[in-house]
């Protein structure tokens, strides 16, 4: 989620979109797994790519950091007259409930979390995207 919502151009390493893993040099990437790709993961990347293409704020909007403590990184992308996009990444081994700022209360979850009355529940080692 962060790659698609941070400023700049998303760079997906060869095969990551299909679930390809690697090892140490010189085996850091094997052959593409034609016919055995992780189709759910490919669909997730396609969904994020379409979302980024549709959200102009992710191409040329501002960046405002919200939090970077206790294994949680959160930021807001904004542009006058455009919808806002927030990303909250949970690096913790446990689910977190991220309390939304008062001006973010009306944002809804696009992917990766669940709205719970003024906060967002984010599973372990995942990220959540919110939008207006």
Put a short name on every predicted segment.
Residues 60, 88-89, 115:
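A conserved amphipathic helix/loop scaffold
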Residues 21-25, 76-77, 120:
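Short glycine-biased active-site loop of nucleotidyltransferases that positions the nucleotide triphosphate
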Residues 102-113:
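Solvent-exposed beta-hairpin/edge-strand motifs
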Residues 3, 15, 48, 88-90, ...:
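Hydrophobic, well-ordered secondary-structure elements that form the walls
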Residues 117-132:
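C-terminal beta-strand-rich structural cap/linker in extracellular carbohydrate-active enzymes
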Residues 1-39:
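Aromatic/acidic polysaccharide-binding cleft in carbohydrate-active enzymes
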Residues 32-66:
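Aromatic- and carboxylate-lined catalytic core of secreted/periplasmic carbohydrate-active enzymes
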Residues 66-102:
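Carbohydrate-binding surface patches
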């Amino acid at each position: 989620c962060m790659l698609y919502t941070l400023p700049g151009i998303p760079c997906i390493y060869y095969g990551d979109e299909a679930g390809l893993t690697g090892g140490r040099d010189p085996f850091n990437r094997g052959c593409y797994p034609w016919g055995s790709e992780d189709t759910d993961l490919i669909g997730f990347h396609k969904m994020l790519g379409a979302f980024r293409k549709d959200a102009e704020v992710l191409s040329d909007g501002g960046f405002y950091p919200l939090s970077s403590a206790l294994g949680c990184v959160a930021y807001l992308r904004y542009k006058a007259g455009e919808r806002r996009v927030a990303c909250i990444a949970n690096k913790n081994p446990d689910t977190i409930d991220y309390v939304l700022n008062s001006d973010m209360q009306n944002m809804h979850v696009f992917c990766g979390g669940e709205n719970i009355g003024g906060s967002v529940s984010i599973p372990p080692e995942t990220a959540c995207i919110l939008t207006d």
